[in-house]
Regions:
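Nuclease catalytic cores
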Residues: 1-141, 148
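Short histidine-centered catalytic/ligand-binding loop motif
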Residues: 68, 101-104, 189-202
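A structural signal for short, well-ordered beta-strand segments and their strand-loop junctions
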Residues: 133, 168-171, 230-235
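Short, solvent-exposed loop/turn segments at secondary-structure junctions
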Residues: 139, 175-177, 238-239
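Metal-dependent nuclease catalytic regions and adjoining charged, substrate-binding loops involved
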Residues: 197-205, 209-309
Length: 309
């Protein structure tokens, strides 16, 4: 099926046109998270009640969070490597991966792998679905009002159902969980997306919809309709739990969780969100340049003062 795709070399991309990444888009539409302020609150909480923060300073709490993030990034890279071996059907590479990463003694990695294998077996079970490609870099050109820019991204995996003539975009996650339900304290997203809650499910949906828009615009066979492109967010958790709401079924023992998009695909809405993020990115770049210029001028002034003596 990969031969049916077009423009995979991305030679059509005009390097003179600016771009913003889809990760940056999600960053700009999400309320700022002040880690230091939250860590200080955790420190104060630890002083008043006996909890996991008791005896820790806010700097130690920040260090713990950074260590946890680094570990998650490491496992994310390992999972990417395993999925590549599995999707490419290279049994020797799979065996080598298992040995090199000592998977037999790593319960977390075993859980990630089990979740992926279960999902892969489930989606391929009918015999109608074919693996198309992975780590596909896509460029989505947006022209709205007086702005012309790209939203750049890299989709995790693409499948094709030959019976239904449907393309399936997959975005892998390896979170402990994906937040789908908020409460009265849950903040909203920003800009044109402020009608949506600040939850993983919604920002991940923004991500896969960008891939969908890009594929329809530049990569899938011409004439492909939006209804023939399905998006799925699949969580491959680090610990086992029984899946109760998987899209592909509710079989006991399944530990992956598959989510359909949180809201309907609306190209006009998406482009407004992307334009907002592009403007924010442009503004931040201008502010950084101005700050760098001011710092440079300050250094020159200090040097001139020094030269006087």
């Amino acid at each position: 099926m990969i031969e049916k795709l077009r423009n995979l070399d991305n030679k059509f991309v005009d390097k003179n046109i600016p771009y913003v990444t889809i990760s940056a888009v999600n960053g700009y539409i999400s309320p700022k998270f002040d880690q230091e302020a939250i860590a200080k609150k955790c420190e104060e909480k630890g002083k008043t009640i006996n909890c996991k923060w008791t005896g820790l300073t806010y700097k130690e709490i920040l260090d713990l969070w950074e260590q946890k993030a680094n570990v998650s990034r490491t496992y994310g890279k390992k999972l990417d490597a395993y999925t590549e071996c599995k999707l490419e059907g290279d049994e020797n590479s799979i065996e080598e991966f298992m040995l090199d990463n000592d998977v037999d003694t790593d319960e977390r990695m075993k859980a990630h792998i089990k979740a992926f294998d279960q999902f892969y077996e489930r989606i391929m079970k009918s015999g109608d679905v074919e693996f198309v490609g992975r780590e596909i870099e896509v460029w989505n050109r947006i022209t709205i009002n007086d702005n012309d820019f790209y939203v750049k991204g890299r989709l995790d995996a693409l499948f094709y159902n030959k019976r239904t003539d449907t393309w399936i975009i997959i975005d892998w996650k390896s979170n402990e969980c994906i937040s789908t339900k908020g409460n009265k304290w849950t903040p909203t997203l920003l800009g044109p997306a402020q009608s949506l809650p600040n939850l993983d499910w919604y920002t991940y949906t923004m991500q896969v919809f960008n891939y969908k828009e890009a594929l329809l615009q530049n990569y899938l066979p011409e004439g492909t309709e939006a209804s023939h492109v399905q998006c799925m967010i699949v969580n491959l958790p680090k610990a086992e739990y029984e899946n109760t709401d998987a899209i592909l079924g509710k079989n006991k023992g399944e530990i992956y969780k598959a989510y359909m998009p949180a809201f309907k695909y609306d190209e006009n809405f998406l482009n407004r969100v992307f334009e907002f993020a592009y403007k924010k990115d442009k503004l931040e770049r201008s502010m950084r340049k101005l700050k760098e210029k001011e710092e440079s001028e300050t250094k020159v002034e200090k040097q001139e003062e020094f030269d006087l003596f």
